[in-house]
């Protein structure tokens, strides 16, 4: 077989070989490293992975791209399973408020936070949203991310929610990264319904959701279950309607106060529960039993300066599968740098480098229901591959604040070279 791409003499390769995940407990440390390895690609698929001498049936031709992996670490394409990528405006004006100790929910109650981004997103044109989205996706790709979950939720009316989701669909067509769309009309209560949130929930269920489903614009539905946002009862209503309409479920819970959202995620069979900064051990056990993946967002804790992080170690001990994400958004976590999030996973949440890589590869893939296609370097999976300028996996979270990516292949095509999108 003539191969299109051969990466050879790889110092360390993280294959993530094994079950399609999600991995949990001690299995999160089993990344199945190969040293002095190689990987062969034909078209958009991985056709062989090994160490030492290449298999005899694989042929290199004059058109084969041969990449030297000496001194490099090679991993599956990274997955960022929780982002708010498409938005208008920015919120640097809130930095001074945060530094003066104004709580996040107080900023939201004053019409800031999510609501200020809603205002900007409603005003933004499709072209403006496309340009902003492409910039952020280029940044993510340069850091090694090849698959991104993207939520709506900065419209809070049918017209703008559809506009956001249409932009997400178009970005998915035009950008190398694969985008997984999530409808999040229940992201906040807009000012016009502040005194009657149940009416807004009716609009999400009866008007927004059918319009989204009719157009095939979303794969998932998400809700922000939090004090001052949506109650457990309201969240359940939205999720039940979304499930009945054929969408898969995810839910923002326990970011600031534990209302019972993690238990709701387990009850509803959500694929992910996200944030989980104040989740009880009892609810961790319920999530583990139900197989809910914990999408942890340490960058948000870092940026909000709350002094606490999700209890990743306890979750791992209880058997909750964990993924990590940037939570990229213009307010509580304005970063596209997944590598910094990996460092926080180690330093702030005491995860091992092996657990961190599991979290951003195969478990990230499971969090967006793509584990059969991506998340590991195995024969038959998509050729989404990252080549890091690092001698081993420990070096990447250890040496933080820079971009370690040398090259990225997406579907077998070189899309990043020398750390730059091409």
UniProtKB/Swiss-Prot annotation:
Q: What class of enzyme is it?
A: hydrolase
Could you tell me what the cofactor note in this record states? Binds 1 zinc or iron ion per subunit.
In terms of one coarse class, where is the protein primarily found?
A: cytoplasm
Q: Which GO terms describe its biological process?
A: L-histidine catabolic process to glutamate and formamide; L-histidine catabolic process to glutamate and formate
Any single Gene Ontology cellular-component annotation = cytoplasm
Any idea which UniProt keywords this protein has? Cytoplasm, Histidine metabolism, Hydrolase, Iron, Metal-binding, Zinc
The residues the record assigns to binding N-formimidoyl-L-glutamate are 154, 329, 331
State the source organism's domain of life.
Bacteria
- List the pathway annotation: Amino-acid degradation; L-histidine degradation into L-glutamate; N-formimidoyl-L-glutamate from L-histidine: step 3/3
Reaction(s) catalysed by this chain's protein: 4-imidazolone-5-propanoate + H2O = N-formimidoyl-L-glutamate
Family statement drawn from the similarity comment of this UniProt entry = Belongs to the metallo-dependent hydrolases superfamily. HutI family.
Kindly provide the name given to this protein in its UniProt entry: Imidazolonepropionase
